[in-house]
């Protein structure tokens, strides 16, 4: 019985370490994405932010076909 218990404890410890590493990676990735999001918000024009916010509002359905992204400066070329 001790052999089974020891094996299970070892397997659980191993799995916990794997999960801890995955959590560390996900936290790091989340922080990176949050920094990127903040940077993009600061670089976006008020018109771009308004357009983005309108796409997120639940009253209006999102367009089925993606639009071409606008070039910096506000006009699509």
From Swiss-Prot:
Region (Leucine-zipper): 19-40
Cellular compartments annotated: Cytoplasm; Nucleus
Key word Nucleus present: yes
Description of what induces expression: By glucocorticoids in lymphoid cells and upon IL4, IL10, IL13 or glucocorticoid treatment in monocyte/macrophage cells. Transiently induced by IL2 deprivation in T-cells. Expression is up-regulated by synthetic glucocorticoid dexamethasone in differentiating myoblasts.
PANTHER family: TSC22, TSC22 DOMAIN FAMILY PROTEIN 3
Family under the similarity heading: Belongs to the TSC-22/Dip/Bun family.
Name of this chain's protein: TSC22 domain family protein 3
Encoding gene (name): TSC22D3
């Amino acid at each position: 019985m001790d052999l089974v218990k020891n094996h299970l404890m070892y397997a659980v410890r191993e799995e916990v370490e794997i999960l801890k590493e995955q959590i560390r990676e996900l936290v790091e990735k989340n922080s990176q994405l949050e920094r990127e999001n903040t940077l993009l918000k600061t670089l976006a024009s008020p018109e771009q932010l308004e357009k983005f916010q309108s796409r997120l509002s639940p009253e209006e359905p999102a367009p089925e076909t993606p639009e071409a992204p606008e070039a910096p400066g506000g006009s699509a070329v």
